[in-house]
Amino acid sequence: MNEDRKKRGLANGKFFTAVAICALFLGSGNVMAAQTASNDSQGVQEQMQSISVTVTVVDTKGEPIIGANVIEKGTTNGGITDLDGVSKLNVKPGAILQVSFVGYTTQEVKATSVMKVVLKDDTELLDEVVVVGYGAQKKVNLTGAVANVDVQEAIASRPVTDIAKALQGITPGLSITTNVGGIGVDSNIKLRGATGSLSATEGTSPLILVDNVEVPSLSLVNPDDIASISVLKDAASASIYGTRAAWGVVLITTKTGKKNDKPRVTYSNNFSWSTPTVMPQVAKTYEGAQAMLLAANRSGASTVSSIGYNVDEIAVQKMKEWYNTYGGMSQSELGEMQLGRDFEERGGKYYFYRQFDPLDMFMKDWTPQQKHNLSVSGGSDKTTYNISLGYLNQQGILKVNTDEYDRYNFNANVNTQIRDWWSVRANVMFSRSTKSEPYQYTSGYTDVWYYLLRWPSFYPYADYQGIPFRSAMTEIAQANRESLTNNFTRVNLGTTINPIKGLAINFDYTFALLNDYQKRNGGEVGGWDMFNSSNPLTYNSSFYGATHNRVVERSRYTMSNTFKAYATYEKSFVQKHNLKVMVGMDAETREKLGHSSDRRTLVNFDKPEINLAIGDQYVDGTTYHNDFAAAGFFGRINYDYMGKYLLEVNARYDGSSKFPSGDQWALFPSVSAGWRLSEETFMKWAKPVLSDFKVRGSWGTIGNQDVAANSFLSVMSVNKSSGWVIDGKQVPYIGIPSVVSPSLTWERVTTIDLGFDARFFNNELGVSFDWYQRTTSDMHSPGETLPSTFGSTTMPKVNSGELQGRGFELSIDYNKRFACGLGLTARATLSKIREKITKYNNPNKNIYGNYEGKIIGEIWGYETDRLFQYEDCYQDADGKWFIDTNKVPSQALYETGAFKYGPGDVKYKDLDGNGEITYCLLYTSDA
């Protein structure tokens, strides 16, 4: 009885919630089928042609289902069941009723006057299959930290152009960032931290697999081709992939055709736009100039001079006058700069008064993007196929000489059943992307965006006498174009043999080729040189000199061959014991080649080509050629008893060419277990609320080979010049051999993970939690300090360091479908991790390097207290401000030249209490 009351109470809440929400959307419309017909003849005729139906909806135990939807198929006519599971409505004779409720399978039945409909439990959520390493498992049977991404929610229902950005915020622990906001830029993907290992070349970037084969970037994949996405987070779930899965795996499968399905041609498109988000506000001319003067006055100066402009009190007043007179006019109305109106020369110095908004002049309010997808899929009883084409076009945010990005995708999957026991498959994936943008004469923190916002708003961005002033806008407008083209081709051939029931033997071979080509076309930028402090009206035909009068061509080539062979055997015993065993091996070879050529002095700026340049030619450090090979043997055992007690054991024996021949191979085991408490008889009391509850834990270790190649080899550097001249020529020299450890081998990444997964209210509400600890041991780090008599003070790297990360992840999702057809989906995620170096050879613990106890991401520096106030300072007879050291600590260490601290400046804390700010610590032992 108590269980029935709880069930009814829960159902009542759902019933009244559904009624309230549906009332908001439907009002008093046509759902009320029993409403009296109107007086017109049409209403009378409609009512005469309908029959009254009473529907009772129950579950398989005969309990009434409250709030179930009862809808006349093909119409909006319907209702919801009451507290007794009953719904009454008028429908057309012969109508089909659709009866549904969350957590139950929808039924379609022919309408009769009195009906009883039994809804069965919908086991879809319990039977949901998640793609894991070399196979798939029921979600409820997972024992590792595996997140399944709802592709429909994350990708299909949104105008997604980049899969990485679509995953942002979907899975806790998966961090997606971009360094810049431009188009065609790859995202940085990190899983459970940012560092993982101090020797990792790409930090905690997970392995990206599409149909079990690595792809170099998610930007190469068309979002429309994706069927499923799984994120394998802990060692137990990711270890099956071995060599490069130390930081987890993002596992993607692409769409395939269906058997006995007629050919389906699908076309979709999306037109959208992007806008700048948070933009800085630049002060008005006179406001910025006044602030500059106030700062200068504090140091005893009455004017400000920088590059080609000057500011004094007269200039501030004239800026106000200009703003009051012309501030309401647009730049097009104002036209070119006019001497006397917009700027003037006084005493051999130039003063500028005109107001500019460089962001408004330089950037669009919005920029378009479009994508198109065309696919053909289908199948017979033997063969299935899915072929798709995709096109994406994005334009940049610049108003002049804007950048543009195009991506073309082709993907084809074909599967054929040759015999009952033998099938073959083929997949071809091709992606081509091209990005075109103006050549950048400056880079890093001094790029065009930096210079666009560096100068005050009176900096001249208009022409004078038909010639522009030097600025970021001038640089972009006059720049030649540079381009980057990526071509990625992948061909996969595979076969599956089923010699006996339950046994599947798979063979797969994949060839992949990535080719990048970049062409940078330099030139010259000229105009009035605002960086000439003596006379900004000096014409300069080449602001950046001969360095950028060049053409650069770069190419990268990566070819890989991957072979996989694995067998899976499944068997159930007495319908209680379920066993799955998998064994296999994989091998990979990879060749990388890169080249860059740079030639100066272009004959014609409009035709920037290597053979049309006549100056010096250079080959830079991006030229390389290297090879890599890896292989591994793996096995996995899955066991469950009645779907309640779950166990998984993995092992890999991996080898990598990155280590010495005697240390290339190592064994990496893992184990995980789970317990579905919700299936126990003692948990029946929670069933009305608790749909499923599982606790799980895992331990495992994976080898990390994401380290510098050939670090165990002693090499000698070759230098072009020794400084010695013999026979009129400089003599090259070869350096002494580098000091290395000949036994440098694998780093080991060990993860402990404890978590639970729970679902409530007929699977509407889900909660998942994980606590984990990841330890990278045998980390490549400096060995013991060598004596100076050894001949080299460079410490060779050895397997001695250790880095540990601890964190947690929480995910909550809610899915609700109301009687009126309205659906509600909500998701919240939370994650936190702290990475700490627990072993490292740095006896002095210099804070500018790595040391034992260092928290990754920590910042050493002065602690700020507040801003200096007037009462902290005093003025001398000349009106200059000084700090009163009787009241606050002296900051004289950083008072240089004419600058003195005063009101409004940042005040540093005196941590050691000696009354003055001194230099910061160099070693943690000084603290």
Regions found by a protein language model. Give the residues of each.
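Short, small/polar-rich motifs associated with maturation and membrane association
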Residues: 1-395, 399-411, 423-424, 845
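Acidic surface patches and DE-rich sequence motifs
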Residues: 59, 72, 82, 788, ...
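Detector for glycine-centered tight turns/loop "hinges" at secondary-structure junctions
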Residues: 62, 85, 104, 212, ...
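Extracellular/periplasmic, surface-exposed regions of secreted and cell-surface proteins
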Residues: 157, 205-207, 211, 413-432, ...
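Conserved small-residue
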Residues: 266-348, 596, 815-922
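Low-complexity intrinsically disordered tracts that form flexible linkers/tails across taxa
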Residues: 280, 427, 435-447, 840-846
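A subset of solvent-exposed loop/turn segments in beta-rich extracellular surface proteins, enriched
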Residues: 280-281, 289-296, 452-465, 528-541
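Conserved small/polar residues in nucleotide/adenosyl-binding loops
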Residues: 923-927
